[in-house]
């Protein structure tokens, strides 16, 4: 997808590759911050799949430290999960769940990225990490998941060196501006925000009926200005 000033991934097309080669040895060439940022997507896949989340909690620190076996397992399982989801809903046409589930954490994350300007101050994975924790917090507030899940996610993300809360960032954000960004997210329908929420690891779902005031209150409680 192509980023615009209005938001992330707003322009794009569907063209499937003939072959995907994943040479995990090349991960050793990444700066540590970039490798940690990539882990946010693995953690997301873990929260979507359940068993992978348990593995992430146990092996995440080793993976971001560059352990070849841990990295290979993370890449393999992430590709396996994403391929299955995309094959079942290639063009994201499913009304419920489907490919949209891969956007767990991204509604919040894309808004944060857009506010920061895509200049490298906040990497995509760092924004997604914070988005995962916020999505879990929103889920808990709405009564969908256990109250301890957000803290468990934050603990894991901090444990691998990722930001997980808005207070981890050096600047403050406006709740109103972030919500305005989320209304323009590619998952939005007629200006209504859609989120991927969770009932627990392995039990994620899409929701288009989240009250905007609940989102704004969450953001203010997390440290945003009004």
Which residue stretches match the model-derived regions?
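A glycine/threonine-rich phosphate-anchoring loop and its flanking beta-alpha core
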Residues: 1-62
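Structural motif
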Residues: 9, 18-20, 126-129, 194
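Alpha-helix initiation and N-capping motif
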Residues: 32, 36, 49-56, 68, ...
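C-terminal charged capping/lid subdomain of soluble metabolic enzymes
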Residues: 40-43, 144-226
